[in-house]
Swiss-Prot record:
Expressed in which tissues: Expressed by the venom gland.
A GO MF term: toxin activity
Family the entry assigns: Belongs to the MCD family. Mastoparan subfamily.
Origin species: Vespa basalis
Signal sequence, renumbered to the chain: 1-27
Residue ranges of the propeptide: 28-45
Modified residues (Leucine amide): L59
Name of the protein described by the UniProt record: Mastoparan-B
The entry's keywords: Amidation, Antibiotic, Antimicrobial, Fungicide, G-protein coupled receptor impairing toxin, Immunity, Innate immunity, Mast cell degranulation, Membrane, Repeat, Secreted, Signal, Target cell membrane, Target membrane, Toxin
């Protein structure tokens, strides 16, 4: 039984990856797909965005 649940969960995650869905998209299906990252949902993405914008300013 435990192995069956593990296999089904792994298959579900693989299908999500196959169709290109992220956890944030599943959590907020009404969100604009091209919008900036939600700071509450993904603080790591917000940090990355600020680093990229800083690099753009420094490099021109």
């Amino acid at each position: 039984m435990k192995n069956t649940i593990l296999i089904l969960f792994t298959a579900f995650i693989a299908l999500l990856g196959f169709f290109g869905m992220s956890a944030e998209a599943l959590a907020d299906p009404l969100a604009e797909p091209l919008a900036d990252p939600n700071a509450e949902a993904d603080p790591e993405a917000l940090k990355l965005k600020s680093i990229v914008s800083w690099a753009k300013k420094v490099l021109g």
